[in-house]
Structure formats: structure tokens, C-alpha cells
Amino acid sequence: MSEDDLKVPEELFKDVKFYVVGDIDQKVVQLLKSGKGKEVSYNALATHIIAEDGDNPEVGESREVFDLPVVKPSWVILSVKCGDLLPVTGFSPESGQVFFGVTACLPHLAEDLNALWAFITFYGGDCQLHFNKKCTHLVVPEPKGAKYECALRHNNIKIVTPEWILDSVKEKNRKDEMLYHPRLTLYDAPEEEGSEYENERSSRSEGSYSDRRSPHSRRSSPTSSRDASPAGRRSPSTKHERKSELMFDDSDDSSPEKEDRNLNWTPAEVLPPGPAKRRLQPGKETGLINLCANVPPVPGSFGPPDARMVGAGAGAGGGVPMGVERLEVMSEWNSAARTLRNITNNTDTQQPSRPSNVAHIIQSFSASSKGVVDHMGNQGQSGIPNQLLLKAQQQLPPEAQQQLLQQQQQQSHQLQQQQQQHQMAQQHPMMLPQVMQMHHHQQQQQHQPPPQQQQQQQNQQGFPQMPPQSHQFLQQQMHQQMYSQHQQQQQQQQQQQQQHAFPQQMRPQQLPRLPLQHQQQHVLQQQLQLQQQHRLQLQLQQQQQQQQQQQQQQQQQQQQQQQQQQQQQQQQKQQQQQQQNQQQMHQQYLQQQQHFLQQQLQQQHMQQLQQQQQMQQQQQQHLQNQQPLQHQNQQVNPHQTQTMLQPPITSAQLFGHEPGHDIPEEGFLVGCIFAIADYPEQMADKQLLATWKRIIQLNGGTVDSALNRCTHLLCESQVSNTYLQALREGKRCVTAHWLNTVLKKKKMVPPHRTLHLPFSFPPGAKPCAQHIISVTGFVDSDRDDLKLMAYLAGARYTGYLCRSNTVLICKEPSGLKYEKAKEWRIPCVNAQWLCDILLGNFEALRQIQHSKYTQFNLPDPLAPNHHLVHNLLSAWRIPVKISPEALASLRLQLKQKQADVSVQPPSKRPKLEELPTPTKSFHLIQHLTSFSQALNLCRLSST
């Protein structure tokens, strides 16, 4: 039936006032109006919000502030098809649902199709039988079928098993689809069908998809389980194909051909050749070119290039300072390093088959760097690193080395002659003209290159084995040496001319000149050493200051931590004192209340005696019969008073049944004897009371009106004689809400919520009558429990929040209601505030701003305060004992029931007993087995 053919029943939506959020189909609006629905212009006036976009701000406001149901347009269409208003819980458009955005295809699931379909649609997803582009998930039990093969070709379609849906619903969170791939499912197949599977494998191996994994390869990760190639839709497979797909077994065939084929079971696992080649390219690029990167840094090369050039070009005479000479040596060292680096690079590119020579050059060069730096101060006036020249000369051919040695011998001979001339000039001043002539003659000889040098240059040019870079390097070093010698000779010539011009005036200063130069150099060296020491001292001082600052900061942090710890300890002490004071006040209040109740009971008893004088004889007989029972109770009282005076009991010390017994779920109330009291409305309704008894008996328990034989007392309030007597006798006092909880869990557990225990004021009292309460952050059963607690305390509950509300109960400090409450200055408290009021702590009404009521994100916000209920929980310290005979008889009864059901299943369920027509409250209890909801319904109907 299409949407155009839908016929809306008359007055189907007569009680619906809808508000549309966003853009929806106008046919949906027409269906609502055809069913007498009314559209409103403001969301606060509506009863239903119709929306497609769950993230719209108006949707959150309607749900959070006004507590209105938000449904999708499909709710309207399906309600029309069903002819009745459907529940709104399964039609929420909000994005926080488990299967929001999931469109699942469910083929080959005839048995579980309805259940899985309901799970997905109820939690926000869509289902369909056709496999098309809208599908996001394919749900199949086994890795086979035409739809499965088609889904493998699309990365955007996720393939899962039905267990993925069930586990996601249990956890209330969408599970990872990769963990539920059907290929990960292990199953057995008959061995004799292996030949058919081999034929099918050989026929499919030429297709567009690969075979399945072998048992050895099935254990690998399922991350690459799909092919990335696009493909169109496939026609449905025939019956023969489905039969052949069922007949396969890859667990026994272990041939090498099969294993080789199954290693690459999908194209996604085969590594393409392109990336593999690219990963090998960096290894090819690593050769001998990067060897120069390992050369150690040059000492002294941190200065700017201009300063190094100036230092290299300056003269190296006797009066040059040590710093200039050091710069000159460093510049020459740098030029040698650059030349050697160029030699290494060219050698690597020209001779790739001889990397050992290059490595030897670099190793010798790096090893000699330290010696060059240490020898700089002792180089004399030449400033040339001799060790560097020797290392470079070792790389030359033998003939070139001999010529260089001859040249160095000539230069050293010239230097010795110059020194002898200086000494002669100092000792014999009259021989100055002859010395000048000899010096001038040597200078001319130096300016004119000797034939040996010319011949050496020609020989160097004729060597075929000598690299051009080393030849250039030697020429540069020789020119620099000659240039420095030339400058020295010019300076010496000028000095000799001055001495010759003024021999008498300069003679006293002529003798100590050279020692003064050495002294100046020594002084400069001392100054440099002092400067370095001063710098080191400054660095040490800075480090000490930083360490002191760090120590001070650490001390300050430690002091702050100690102060915070002290403050926390003080706060804890204050809180403990406040709790002790509250406990004392509560105990005093309970004593006063019990005394007041006893006085009231005595007065009522006296009035009854005065009004019923004719019944005195019967009352006396009744009292005589009760004397033995009272005597027994008095003997038990000392033991009970000891248990009541014990300290508060924690939940870890409470028991249900004995831990060693294995009790079946069908009879989990075995050994429990219930007495029902203080439920006047339910006691008056005989039909409701019979339902309670029948449900208890069906789960293994019994109901008895005598209090002395019972183990559990179902009561609503603590203000009654029956409750006081049961408390003295050590009975377990619980409410019908606790019974409803254990019926759901199928296990008798101690009370762990406030509603599981009777409240501490009479049923007619209303301690919170002045409050209008709203709730935020609580959902499902927690929200229903808070509604019932507010009703029991006499407060008015509203699903929305407005300025007239007096209290907002929050689960966490967030949300739209919380922000509005802060803006309107409405007190925001946790659920413990309402729990304390129900359990007798009426001081919470005045202490609504107390710090313990503003602590949110509690692990169990509806749990009772153990300081207020320790007397109620003392009976749960002793587990309920079950005799082996009772447990054996229970198991025998359960087996007989199962046998009867299996032998002759009844076509129609027989009636257990003749009962009148059930009312609405009984109908709810029969289907939901929820005592708390029935209680709430009865009270609301009475009010």
C-alpha cells in the first residue's frame, strides 16, 4: 500500500497537537490533519514534535526543556497503517541512537528477520531486503551469496553477522564491524564435498574476485577484506549456485598450490609494485657523496666571512698580534678543508670504484684537525699549518713530493740566512750597509722565480696522475707562503733603513726590540686567557643562578602542595564533624518521633477501650494467648539490640541467598516467606493482592500472614507497629519496588536503591509539598523512579522547566535545563537530596545549598545513605539459608514442568483461576510485572 492510498481512520490523531521542525513531506501533514490532528505554532503547546533532523536546536529544546516526544514522519505513516497510535520510543530522529545512519540489508534470515528488523529500526536505523546504493551494512550469517560477493567490491558497505546487531543492542553502543565479519566465523563442513569445492574454486579463480582464506590464513587481521575496484549489481544467484556455495571445505586441503593461492586471498593484500620500488630508491641514493658530511666542524670558522678574508690577507710580520695570526691560520685551515671537500666530491663522482682513498683522506684530515689547532700558537711568523701541508703532500705522486721537499729546503735556507743577518746587525751595527745589500739581493732573487721552481711547475703540469684540485691547492699554499715572506722582508728592509739613517739614536732601542715583541705576544695571550676565564666564570654564575631559581620554584611548589593538603584535611574534618552532628540530630529526631508515635498509639488504644467496653472479655482472652509470644520476643530482644547498635553496614557485607548454592532462575525466591502490610489500597483490592501472591509463588516464594514465620516484610512506611515489630525481630523490610527489581533480575539481591526501602514518614504526610521539581540528565528507569519519589514526598513533578520550578535535580552539571536554572537562580541539586528526605533527613529541606548536594556525576545517584538506613540493612548481613531437601524438590518440580511442556504442548494456555474482568492496573501488572508502576497508577487514579 503506497502513501497515496492510505486511509486515515476518523479521529485517529484527535488528541495530537503536532509541531513541525524543519522540512518534512506535506503528505505527512495532510495525514495528521485528516485524522483530526491540530498543528500549533509553538513547541511548548504541542504534544508531539515531528522532525527529520535530530540535531536541530529546536529538537533538543523540545525534548530537554519541555519533555516532549520527538518522532520521525514514519511514525505517522505506520500509525495510519496500523490503525492506532504507535509508541513513540522507537521513532526518535536524534543522532545519538545506536543504529543512527545505518541502512541494513537482511537476506537469508528467514527465522530471525523480524527480530533483527525490529532491533535496527527501534534504535534509529533502516532495513530493506533489496541490495542497492542506499545500503551501508550487509547482514549475512555466512561468507557466501551474490550480495556478499557484490558487497566485497565496495569499500563503503560493511559486512557483518547478526551477532553484531545483538551485541550492539546489549552494550547500547555500536560495536566495531571488523570484528563481526562473516569470514571470521569458524564452522565445519563434510570432507566428501571437497571435490566440488575444488571444482568451484578452479572455476572462480579466473573471475574478478579471489578465493577465501585457508585455515592458516584465516587467523590474520580482517582489515583488508574488500576489493577497491567498483562493480555493478549482480543478478540473484540460482538454487544450484546457492547449493554449490554451501558445499565447500577449506579445512582439510593443505596442498602447496592451495596455500600459495590462499596467501593472497584478496587483491587488497597484494603489495603493488610501484610502492615497493619507491621504498628501495633511498637505499640506492646512499653512496660516497655523503661522506663529507662526517667531516668534523672547523674550529674557529664561526666568524663572518669578511673577518676570515681580512685575517687571511693580513701580513704575518714580527709586530702582528696573535689574534690576527690566529685568524690567518684559521682562514688557511678553512680553505684547505674546502679544497679537500671538493677533492672528495670530485673523486666520488669520477671514481666510484675507489671509495677507500676518499675515506682515508677524510679520516686523516679529521684526525689532523686537533693538531693544527694546538700548533697554531707555535707556527712563528709564517702562519702556515705544516701538518696540513704534509697530509696533502702524502696524497701526491713521488716525483711531486721530491720537488716540494726541495722547494721547502730552499725556503728554510733563506730563512736561516735572514736570521743570521738580523743577528749580525744586532751584534755589529757597522755592518748594516753590507747586510742591507745582501738582503736586497735576496729579495730580488725571491721576486725572480728560480729555474727550479719553473721546472717544478712544468713538471707538475706534466703529471697525468695528479688531480687538478690538489694541484690548485698546492699552488695556493705556495703563493700564500711567498707572499707572507715578501711582506716580512719588506718590513725588515724598512727597519734596516731606519737604523742606517739614524744609527746613533735608535741603537739603545734596537737591541730589546725583538724581546718586546715576544713580550707583547705573551701579554696578548695572557689577556685572551683571562677573557676566556672571565667568560667561563660568567657562565658558571649564570648556571648557579638558574639552579637556585629552580630550587626556589620547587620549594614554592612543595609549600603550595602542603598548604593544599592541609586545607583538604581541614575540609574533610569539617565535613566529618557536620556528618556526625547530622547523625546525632537524626537519632534524636527518630527517638522523639518514636516516642510521639507510641503516645499516639496509647491514646488511640485508650479511646478504643472506652468505646468498646463490651469487647473486654474477648480482648483479655486475646492478650492471654499473646503472652507466650511476647515472652519469646523478650528473650530475643537482647540479641537484636546488639545488632541494631552495630556500626553502619556497607553494601559489600550484605547477602541474599547463601553464596555456595546454585539456585535456578525459575525459583530464585526459594526460602523466602513474604508478609504484606501497610499497603491499604492494595489490600483493599483483592484482585491485585491475589496477583502479587501468584507471582511470588511462581518464582519459588511463599506468602504468609503471620509475621513470626516470614523472612521478608513488604511495607511502604516506617511508621507502623508491624514495621517496628519486624525490625526488632530482624526481618528484612523492603518495598514492592524491590520485589519488582529482583523479578527483573531473576536473583534475590540486597536493596541498593532508595525506593527499595520504606520511607520514614506516614503515607499521608507531604514534606516536599511546597516544591515543584524538574529533572535533567536521567533517562528510562531512573527518570521514572525520580517521578515516583517526588510523588511520595508530596512534591509536584514537571517534565519541563520554567521560572515557577523550585528545584532542579541534575545528574551532571550540563544541559539546557541546567543553564536555564542557573540563569533563573533555581537551586540545582543531585538525587541524594530527595533520597535523604524520603529516609528521614528533613534537614535537607533547609540545607538545599549544602556542598554534598552539589556533587554531581555520582556512580549510583539513587543509592541510599548508609548512615540513615543501617538499621534496615542489618538483617541482610545474614544470608537466607536453604535446606538441601527444599532445593532438590524445587529442581524436581522444574524438571516435571519442562517434561510436561515437551510431551504435550497446550494449544491454548488454560486459566489458572476464575477471576473477574481485569482492570487497567491489573492488566499493566500482568504484562509488565512492575509493582512500582502499578503503585503509581493507583495513587494517581485516587488523586
UniProtKB/Swiss-Prot annotation:
It comes from Danio rerio. This is PAX-interacting protein 1. Interacts with smad2 via its last three BRCT domain-containing regions in an activin signal-dependent manner. Involved in DNA damage response. May function as transcriptional cofactor in TGF beta signaling. Accentuates Smad2-dependent transcription. InterPro entries: BRCT_dom, BRCT_dom_sf, DDR_Transcriptional_Reg. It is found in: Nucleus. Its main location: nucleus. Residues 220-230, 620-635 have a biased composition (Low complexity). Pfam families: BRCT, PTCB-BRCT. Gene3D superfamilies: BRCT domain.
